[in-house]
Amino acid sequence: MESYLFKNKFIAVVYFITLNLLFIFNGYANLQRANPLENKYPIIPTPQEITYGDGELAFKTIHITASDFKNESDGLSAFFKKEGINESSNGVKIQIIKEQLPVINPDEAYKLSIDSDIKIWASTEKGAYYAIRTLQQIVRRKGQGGLLPKLEITDWPAFKIRGFMHDTGRNFQSVDQLKEQIEVLSQYKYNVFHWHLTDDPGWRLESKLYPQLQSEDATSRGKGKFYTQEDFKDIVAFCKARHITVIPEFDIPGHSQAFRKAMGFETMKDERALPTLLDLFDELCGLVSAEDMPFIHIGTDEVRNREEYVEDGFVKQIMDRVRAHDRDLIVWMEGIEVKGDSTSINQLWAQFDPRPGHRFIDSRANYINHLDPFAGMSRLFFQQPCRQPKGDSLALGGILCAWPDNNVANERDILKQNPIYPSIVFYSDAIWKGRKENKLDYWAKLPGLNTTELQEFKVFEDKVIVHRDFFFEGKEFPYIRQTDFQWNVIGPFENNNDVNLKFPVENALVASYNVDGEDYKWSEPKVGGTLHFKHFFGFPALTNEKTGTFYATMEVYSPDDRLQDFWVGFQGWSRSGGRRVGPFPDQGQWHTTNPKLWVNNVEIAPPNWKQPNLGTRTDEIPFIDEDYFYRSPTKIQLKKGWNTVLLKIPQDNNSWKWMFTCVPVDIENNQVREVSDLKFRTIF
């Protein structure tokens, strides 16, 4: 590379000056250029301190010469063997050394050095395990051996709790499917699996004291599907081997329909309800030791129905019983406030803050069932867990939650219809590395062109794409590089709540328009696969207006005539609350607000919906093709050369989400990828 670029000193100086001027012009002068090794061997989550060396370490075999952590070294040996790399006395030397590291959260910290040999330092098995997880991410096969980048890492987590939650009370998932996801969690250094075991549709953990909890009469979804006590202990052991703690949740007194039906209680005020629950929490705590399962979650949120109300002291007695088993107690915030409670851990949701003096876990604004695969990843990347750079004695960390409340037809649909795996990868960086600031401006949109923040996102996104291709083959990963896409948008034009009103944009694309005496101009380029004009949770977006009509345009270059697959959508249907703010569109509509899409002046027809015109309260009717990323892609004819894409996105008072997605995709064997030979540009 140097011999090609730098023929002599003069050219080198000119090149250097020009390059730096270019970076200054683009607003990236304060960012280091990525080392080529970093591009080839990206690590997620990003280590706290990392220096890439000069070149790579090639090896045929390995030789673990010393290890103070036998379980971890055995696991590393098994990993290499699975990769086809055996141990031998003349292999590359690997040492795993026990040593106290002078960093925050030293129990999970590690150092990793790769040069002519490999050294790992950690003070605990956890630290050694995370070092090995990092090492596993950067091994590349070459012939009969392997390659590793030369580097030095010192790493530790910003937060002590880095978790993920599944709601199996509403929708059961098999042990195998849970284990698949837990394995991925461990790869990205999560250390908590929050297991929501009970909800209105079912009580999913076997009780030998009250077997009627698993009866078909008590269960409204997935009848006969529950976890035996042996299943439960198996998952706990599987997690423990990966240094993940299970937090089981029995959510009471709300979300208790299955419990009440099973026990024959009309309301939670039935005098038998509390003794029964005390028995159930005793039974739960008896399954696993306090050392291996130190937290118990009792819910207490959303007590909104008369039959869920309880007397004062009800929840306090459950708290006392759980604490008597030497467990830390977790409750949702917002939830029932218990007089005298000063020690419960508050798990935050929506926009709630912790109670003063309480330890807390942050689950605000990161419910995966609401997340679009593109815009949602910006939120997970830029949000600051606990709204502070790192954890402390009160700010314990965060838990990413999946709440697909609606009934699902097949357990795999939970992974197909929610961006589970992309969310795990993006959030892992924020919860391990930490964030210096909470960048609320980018919770619903990507930063503007030529900003440091966009460049930071692009760098991380490139890492995600490498991980997607290396580590998620055969798994649902609905994400492509969205920083490739730039849009000009114009509006909102006043539509007086008439979504069918047409504006001059539909007649000709020109730089500006005058409508009813008001001038409209196309915006500077907006970046992203999904654009929110106004976000449904009120996060900063492109407008503060509640109604109107926007248009968006870009050009796509194709090297040939082709029928190209696109992901197209105008409403991200949250996978909860039925068809929230429905009804679902009828045939011939993209959405009830009548958005339009034209390519080269040809209108693109919406899908032939499998379940058109369903009403809002349709929680029990599973989704099939409601969202763009799990239905068949829209096929659009592209001509050779530049193709003009134009979208119309109206909004009225009856709709909730004002947004669109329109990106070309390459899908093969259910794996989505970028279309590598297409190019994109804005017009204005």
What are the roles of these predicted feature ranges?
Residues 105-295, 317, 404, 621-623, ...:
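Feature activates predominantly on carbohydrate-active enzymes
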Residues 20, 28-154, 331-336, 342-344, ...:
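Acidic, contiguous N-terminal accessory segments
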Residues 560-589:
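A short beta-strand element within beta-rich, extracytoplasmic domains
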Residues 544-557, 630-634:
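Short beta-strands within extracellular/lumenal beta-sheet-rich domains
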Residues 579-581, 587-662:
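Beta-strand-rich ligand-recognition modules
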Residues 20, 35, 39, 458-548, ...:
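Accessory carbohydrate-binding/adhesion or oligomerization-edge regions at the termini
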Residues 259-345, 350-354:
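Active-site neighborhood of glycoside hydrolase catalytic domains
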Residues 350-482:
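Flexible, acidic glycine-rich loops studded with aromatic residues
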